[in-house]
Regions:
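Structural signature of beta-strand start/N-cap positions in the alpha/beta core
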Residues: 8, 33, 71-73, 97, ...
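Alpha-helical elements of Rossmann-like donor-binding domains used by nucleotide-donor carbohydrate transfer enzymes
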Residues: 21, 25, 47, 65, ...
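Short beta->alpha connector loops
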Residues: 15-18, 80-82, 105, 131-133
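Alpha-helical structural signal in soluble globular domains
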Residues: 25-29, 48-52, 90-94, 110-117, ...
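Beta-loop-alpha module in the N-terminal Rossmann-like domain of NAD(P)-dependent dehydrogenases
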Residues: 57-117
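A contiguous active-site-proximal alpha/beta segment in oxidoreductase catalytic domains
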Residues: 105-144
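Short hydrophobic "strand-cap" motifs at the C-terminus of beta-strands
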Residues: 12, 101, 128
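N-terminal Rossmann-like dinucleotide-binding module
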Residues: 1-53
Length: 144
């Protein structure tokens, strides 16, 4: 089997409750080149820069810098819920695949519009909704 280069993924936002955990997972995955983070809020960015979840992370100066990098193929959107759809829209408009945490945002129609744009551009949008720690799923895993 031929080896492939790691997938270059960036993170947009740090305000979601799971943001630093996802940054840690992306950084540790050998199949991912976690290439940086952009956070529009100076206060949130400075706080995140002091946390262990972002240790060693590159920080972009603007969304345009991150989204304009053609080597970045996907972006994990990790802002506040009310910000996520606008962030995701910027990402798909820039031709990036998107990973969104739950909930995707506040307005279903906006989410559906993003999905339509992504589909038209041949992009993937993945909504994270994991049950791996749910007791019922743990029992299923134990039986498998």
């Amino acid at each position: 089997m031929a080896s492939t280069d790691p997938v270059r993924i960036a993170q947009y936002g740090v305000s979601h409750a799971h943001a630093s955990g996802h940054a840690s997972v992306l950084s540790a995955d050998p199949e991912v080149d976690f290439c940086g983070v952009y956070e529009p809020s100076v206060d949130a960015r400075e706080s995140a820069q002091r946390s262990s979840g972002y240790e060693g992370a590159l920080w972009f100066d603007s969304a345009d810098e991150m989204l304009g990098d053609d080597s970045i193929v996907a972006v994990a959107v990790e802002g506040h819920v009310h910000e996520c759809l606008a962030m995701a829209r910027e990402c798909v408009d820039a031709g990036k695949h998107v990973w969104l945490d739950k909930p995707a945002g506040d307005v279903l129609e906006e989410f559906e519009e993003i999905l339509d744009i992504a589909r038209d551009k041949g992009l993937l949008v993945q909504l994270g909704y994991m049950f791996r720690y749910n007791e019922a799923f743990q029992r299923i895993f134990a039986l498998a």
